Amino acid sequence: MLLLPFQLLAVLFPGGNSEHAFQGPTSFHVIQTSSFTNSTWAQTQGSGWLDDLQIHGWDSDSGTAIFLKPWSKGNFSDKEVAELEEIFRVYIFGFAREVQDFAGDFQMKYPFEIQGIAGCELHSGGAIVSFLRGALGGLDFLSVKNASCVPSPEGGSRAQKFCALIIQYQGIMETVRILLYETCPRYLLGVLNAGKADLQRQVKPEAWLSSGPSPGPGRLQLVCHVSGFYPKPVWVMWMRGEQEQQGTQLGDILPNANWTWYLRATLDVADGEAAGLSCRVKHSSLEGQDIILYWRNPTSIGSIVLAIIVPSLLLLLCLALWYMRRRSYQNIP
């Protein structure tokens, strides 16, 4: 665990209250997915994330990082970035080779997939906690705590055997320790500061209502769409007056291409119960001015046609009467 210097806390949390002043991401992590088809073919994908926002990719062909934002390097120099890229290149190549070499010893049956996540998180009060977890086929396999390999119960004897093997490689464990407990915290602070304008921006949501597929005879599905908001935390609820409707179903918060978010909230009701319902949206960007949209039964196509045709016919009738009356006056000698 690392404690932030006071000066950096003041930059990230200018209001003095870290729990409320900083509403952007608070963690950085890299994700590795390695797929092993057979003893000679493997593919690894990598990416870097601030919470749910991707800021790095990995080009497997060139073995270089892809920086998705101008500030994705944080405060690291080009030399430091090049050194890290070299570490990851060597690691990815060596990891695939070692796994294939030891697959038989660990009774690994092709094809299989290994996932890994490693990073660090800024906690309230300024502490930074680092983490590393590995999974095999979607099941927890091991973690690193206090620079030691800890097998997961789901990994069984295979995970225990792996940890016993890896701790013999002191050079690898020292590199992991440096990356987790020194490099990652320093990078996290730098990138949060470098990307501060983007990460702490406030973008107001847009909201609209629609009807979804009918859930059954005599019933309606009301849908409240909320899109384009940032940061991610949002509160959406179907209401009747001030009473929350407990049947409200929230979907997953999904990313838009422009680093904003989308959410939909649905409510199934009987035909006669939709009147008086509203969708309420709360978000930090609204500064307490909640969005409230009231449900109105959609107008039928027939009503729309009548609303257009009837006035048009009346207008034509008036014009015809005016024209006939004008002609009749002209025929008077």
Curated annotation (Swiss-Prot):
GO terms for molecular function: endogenous lipid antigen binding; exogenous lipid antigen binding; lipopeptide binding. GO terms for biological process: adaptive immune response; antigen processing and presentation, endogenous lipid antigen via MHC class Ib; antigen processing and presentation, exogenous lipid antigen via MHC class Ib; immune response; positive regulation of T cell mediated cytotoxicity. Glycans are attached at residues 38, 75, 146, 258. InterPro entries: Ig-like_dom, Ig-like_dom_sf, Ig-like_fold, Ig_C1-set, MHC_class-I_related, MHC_I-like_Ag-recog, MHC_I-like_Ag-recog_sf, MHC_I/II-like_Ag-recog. Residues 325-333 are cytoplasmic. Residues 18-303 are extracellular. Residues 185-295 form the Ig-like domain. It comes from the Eukaryota. Expressed on cortical thymocytes, on certain T-cell leukemias, and in various other tissues. The chain crosses the membrane at residues 304-324. The keyword Protein biosynthesis does not apply. Pfam families: C1-set, MHC_I_3. It is found in: Cell membrane; Endosome membrane; Lysosome membrane. It is a single-pass type I membrane protein. Keywords: Adaptive immunity, Cell membrane, Disulfide bond, Endosome, Glycoprotein, Immunity, Immunoglobulin domain, Lysosome, Membrane, Signal, Transmembrane, Transmembrane helix. A motif (Internalization signal) lies at residues 329-332. One of its GO terms (cellular component) is lysosomal membrane. Disulfide bonds join 120-184, 149-163, 224-279. Residues 1-17 form the signal peptide. Heterodimer with B2M (beta-2-microglobulin). Interacts with saposin C. Antigen-presenting protein that binds self and non-self lipid and glycolipid antigens and presents them to T-cell receptors on natural killer T-cells. During protein synthesis and maturation, CD1 family members bind endogenous lipids that are replaced by lipid or glycolipid antigens when the proteins are internalized and pass through endosomes or lysosomes, before trafficking back to the cell surface. Interaction with saposin C is required for the loading of bacterial lipid antigens onto CD1B in the lysosome. This is T-cell surface glycoprotein CD1b.
